Amino acid sequence: MLVGDAAEPGNQWVAPTNPYYIKPLPIPAPDVAKAKALLTAAGTPNPVVTLMITTLSERMQIAEVIQAMAKESGFDIRIQATEFTSAQQHAADGDFDAFFWGWGGRIDPDGNISSILGCNAAFNYQHYCNPEVDRELEAARELDARAERLAHYRIVAEHILHDLPIIYLYHPKWLYAHTARLSGFIPYPDGMIRPQGLQLE
């Protein structure tokens, strides 16, 4: 993978190493022949799709890999690099074919999906709405036991991986560097830096 050890490939809203990852639903193997057949059956063997990305060098490199891989199936991906604030506005307005963006991640799995794929969620740029997904997310949110929550998340994952309102690609691994003079630094799984307790000697 282009980002190497700095990220973990994934197909769900949490990484495969996360205890809430639904292991019976792993990353599927590529099937170029099936993709071509589906496009032909749809009457659009060579669709043109504009992929909006933010102007980060890493995003451009990954978008170019997506472009090359999709071309094997017949897609003509046009990359549109857009300044971050403008890209967010285009996304909020629904003014895009496909939008490659990232989410910082939250410690609780609910924070990685409810605000993005809930029917009336603030970051639901794709305007996805599945009432059953909403019900299952709400049910999982009210539980503490992991096994019970996983049962609800399994149903959610089955819907998301079937409907594909989002195609998850990878989960970044948070890397930090600091001077030896800094003490009290604690890395958190969501990547957010908490300044409480930090001391510079």
Where are the regions that the model predicts?
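Detector for C-terminal structural segments
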Residues: M1-Y20, S57-Q67, A87-E201
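Short secondary-structure junction motifs
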Residues: N11, N46-V48, G74, L164
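Short beta-strand->loop
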Residues: P24-L25, A29, T50-S57
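Immediate post-signal peptide segment of exported/extracytoplasmic ligand-binding proteins
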Residues: V32-T50
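Conserved functional loop/turn residues at catalytic and ligand-binding sites
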Residues: G43, G74, D95
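Short, well-ordered beta-strand elements
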Residues: N46-T55, I77-Q80, D97
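Early extracytoplasmic/lumenal segment of secretory-pathway proteins
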Residues: D76-Q89
